[in-house]
Amino acid sequence: MEEILQMSALELSKQIRHGSVSVKEAVEACKKQIQKAESQVHAYVSMDEKILAHRIKEVEEGIKSGRYTGPLAGVPIAVKDNICTRGQKTTCSSKMLENFVPTYDAQAVKQLEDAGMVILGKTNMDEFAMGSTTETSAFGVTRNPWNPEHVPGGSSGGSCAAVAAGEAVMALGSDTGGSIRQPAAYCGVTGLKPTYGRVSRYGLIAYASSLDQIGPIGKNVKDCAALFEIIAGHDSKDSTSADVPVESYDSLVSGGLSGMRIGIPKEYLAEGCDEEVKKALADAVHTLSKNGAVVEFFSLGMVDYVIPAYYIIACAEASSNLERFDGVKYGYRTPGATELHEMYKKSRAEGFGEEVKRRILLGSFVLSAGYYDAYYMKALRAKGLIKKEFDKAFQKYDCILAPASPTTAPKIGTSLSDPLQMYLSDIYTVAVNLAGLPAVSLPCGMDSKGLPIGMQLIGDCFQEKKILRAAAAYEQLRGEFPKAWAKEEK
């Protein structure tokens, strides 16, 4: 069983397709690890044994018959609980959707099932993806597999923790302001936020529609590239879906560092960035420079406007998107309300958690008469200027290197006691969403407390190949990164 957990997703699928490992054995290896670690990690919110047993049989038969021949056929995967799965609860880790069972699959789910992957279950997250720690879930906190006193990051904390703990071989997450990249950094795994529009948002329960994007989480860059190839592509059911062809995962990660120009924004290493994070990034720069890349510092404008612009736009869109959850057609309905207005008020007050209510209030405020121009329109203008700054940078550089977070994973409880500090921790990730760019986060070191440090490579729109190529080359030079679950074995 341990041999199965050691394999990459691509290796495991190869073994399954060659008949050396069965789909059932692969799933059982993950389930054994879930039984061992889940009481401490709490990565999952739901697993349906009946659906899983049926799917194992279906995939095993499909591989034998030649229906499933892809590079990830038979691989067990976890799915974030804001991505719809037909017949299986999709709660957004909220009391508001505690009993919601979708009647359809998200397009990304359909594509990974068409590729022969096996969904293990739904992972915990910050409620409605609003948070950076996976502490705002209505169903309990997810803990970092490296140290259970620390958060796994968020909002895709359950997905990243599941991969780090060996409870899944891969996972799907969503990224609105860093929600794949930051928890991937905290958990020592790899996460890709694709270009906005690359992966269909059909079936993703919306937080901020102009920023949300589904992406892969895995043990290494090549696994993520293979899953990206599967889930990317045009979808007529999503009006923001881009019709841009995706290269094969092999070509996405090939090419090496020779001749690549990589820029580092000076502003990202200023005050607020932990010294150990700076040191790990400096070591990564040395590795990249020594092996053919040209790495230099440059100045990226508009950095001071990134956090305010992001939270104004994201909260405004959230307040609009979450209006539908009123207890009438969708969401929790309070028992015993005597009239309609009371039912609306109580259902939303009882169904949403504190952080979600805070963001709905903030969003409603910036969209209200008298404040719309002063806040929301100004934030949209700032968003356009931020994109122009990146456009300018990409005229000179193939990709931008930055920390994924200013610190390693904080202790549980510290972020929620200071929401402003939690918002500021997104400083390096949110600009990527505002500009609609792709970025990949991967481990580049450990701090003195034994917690992973992550870096991100940011690319121009639809230039996933450049960032994945650089990330794969760096990963090969860095060598095998330790595994959190293997640490527990010792």
Task: Name these PLM-found stretches.
Residues 36, 114, 165-170, 174-272, ...:
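Structural helix-boundary/capping segments
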